[in-house]
Amino acid sequence: MKLYVFNPDADMALGNNEENYMAPATIRRMAEDLALLPIWYAQPGSGVLASSAYNADYLKQMQQLFRLDVHLVTEPELPDYADVRVMPWGWNPAIRKRMLKGGVLEKNLPTPDALDKYRMKAARSNALAFRALFYFNKIDYTCGDGCCLVEADGRMTDISPDIVDRYKEGCVFKSLWSGSGKGLCWCRHGFTKNVSDWCSRALKENRGFVMEPIFDKVEDFAMEFYSDGRGKLLFVGYSRFVTDDKGAYRGNILTSDEQVEEWIQQYVPFEAFVRIRNMMQKALEIGK
């Protein structure tokens, strides 16, 4: 049986990389409030880890309305499901320890070495390869010039304030692991002490960060792909969402894929957009 777990702190926990990591209170509250989110994508016959106190009635209603073949599993019940296959929102040392401590068999959990490899694959720096891919293949309607990875041994002397001078509109520094707009440092008014301190922490904790120009962004959306586990990667749809002026996630726009494609054609010809999507799919398939 598969056991689905919604842990929205997955990317932040990867950045911390400690098994005793504790997410901020707001993220912990989100995990509690949305614990049943996996019922909408869980395979039939699976369990979803959540508290029964305020989730049981809601799940019962959804089961009656939509004939969902999923059931609730609480934390104290984990020893009864020791041989499950855990399906978290994202793996990291903290969720591994939580499942192990709860009673899941260690053989059913990823090893520390596997988590290290997963962490490197999840690093934001991997996205820089796509910039080079689009550049060398001369793909129209793409941007990304000026994005780079800053690596060092943790000493602030390894990065010069002059590095930001080439960006007329300023630049943004991004942690290698973060989510929902966290882990961003905006440099709009020169290399201030706050920016310098942020860079020092990023170099010390993660040995690097990504630097990008501040683009004249219109809106946000994402392409979503699914790996079938047998070497095939499929495009499954779009996600259109909203962020604030600091890049923090604020919510999603409920819309169909067709409506997203109609919207995007205001800015990019559809044929060019499909070429970009297809190249992304092929590159992800090769790189996974």
Please place each PLM-identified region on the residue numbering:
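N-terminal-proximal low-complexity accessory segments that begin disordered
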Residues: 1-47
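Gly/Ser/Thr-rich loops at beta-strand to alpha-helix junctions
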Residues: 9-12, 53-57, 90-97, 177-181, ...
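Well-ordered, non-membrane alpha-helical segments in soluble/globular domains
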Residues: 24-36, 124-133, 156-158, 192-197, ...
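Conserved N-proximal alpha/beta basic substrate-recognition cap immediately N-terminal to
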Residues: 27-43, 49-158
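A charged, amphipathic alpha-helical module
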Residues: 147-185
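Glycine-rich phosphate-binding loop of ATP-grasp-fold ATP-dependent ligases
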Residues: 170-195, 222, 245-264
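Phosphate-binding site of ATP-dependent enzymes
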Residues: 195-248
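ATP-dependent carboxylate/phosphate-activation module, predominantly the ATP-grasp catalytic core
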Residues: 227-287
